[in-house]
Amino acid sequence: MSQKIYFKITNDKECHNGFQYKDGLNILQEKFNDNLEDSCVPGRLYFTKPKHILKYLDYGIYLREIYLPTDNPDFKMIRDPTGDKYGANMIILGERRDLRNPDTWKYMVSKGVDIRAEDDYAVKWASKNGHLKVVEYLVSLGADIKSDGDYAVRWASENGHIDVVKYLVSQNADIRADNDYAVKWASSNGHLEVVKYLVSQGANIREQNDYAIRLASQYGHLEVVKYLISLGADIRADNDCAVRLASENGHIEIVNYLISQGADIRAKK
C-alpha cells in the first residue's frame, strides 16, 4: 500500500454514482474506464490531492483519507483530464472526519490544505451551510469573509443561518452587497428572523424595485410579506407583480392579504 495520502469527500450515506463506499479496500465492480479523454465518468473511483480538495466541498460532509493499493497487481489508476483529480479501480478508505467539525479543518491544514484556495470557498461553504465554529476557525486563519462580493453573508442569509450572519456582521461583512442580495434572498426563502436582523443593520427592503416583497409573495412566505409591508414595502411595485406571482403559485392567503392592502388583481404585466 502506498503511504502517500489523498482525499475524497463523501456524503452522509457514502454512496456516490451507485457505488457504496466502505472502510478499507473498495474495488470497482464494473469495467475500469481508462480513456484518457474522459472526465467525471462512471467506471472510476475518484480522489484528489489535498491541495485540490476544496474544489469538492459540495460533494458531502465527510473527509476521507485515501490510500492506494499499489502492491496489488490488478491496481489501475488514471489522471483525469481536468488535472485536479484521479480515478482508480480500487482505493483504500482510511479515517473519516466530519467537515462540520473545526478539528477536521485543523487536520486539513496540517496536510497542506490552503483554506483560502478557490477564492476563499471554504468560508463561503461553511457560511452557506451554517457551520459557525468552522467559519470562526477559518476566519482565525485569515479567511476573507468579504471575498466574491461578501458572498459568505449573502449565502448565510439566503439559507437562514442567523448565528453565522450575526458573526459575519461582527467581522464587518457588508449586508448590502450586490444590491441588498442578503435581505432579498432571506425574504425569498422565508427566513423572517434573518430579514428582521438585516433590516436592523440597515438593509434596504425596497432595493431593486421592492424585489424582496415580490420574492416573498412568489414563494408563499406570508409572515415575511406582512413584515415587509409594515416597513413600507410597495406591494404594487412593477405593476402589482407581488399579487400576480402569489396568484401564479397558488398562495391564496398571500393573495387575499395583498388585496386587503390595496393590490390590484387586474393589473397587467
UniProtKB/Swiss-Prot annotation:
ANK repeats: 118-147, 148-177, 179-207, 208-237, 238-267
This protein's record includes keyword Transport: no
Record Pfam families: Ank_2
InterPro entries in UniProt: Ankyrin_rpt, Ankyrin_rpt-contain_sf
Disulphide-bonded residues: none
Source domain of life: Viruses
UniProt keyword list: ANK repeat, Repeat
Name assigned to this protein: Putative ankyrin repeat protein L23
Taxonomic lineage from the root: Viruses, Varidnaviria, Bamfordvirae, Nucleocytoviricota, Megaviricetes
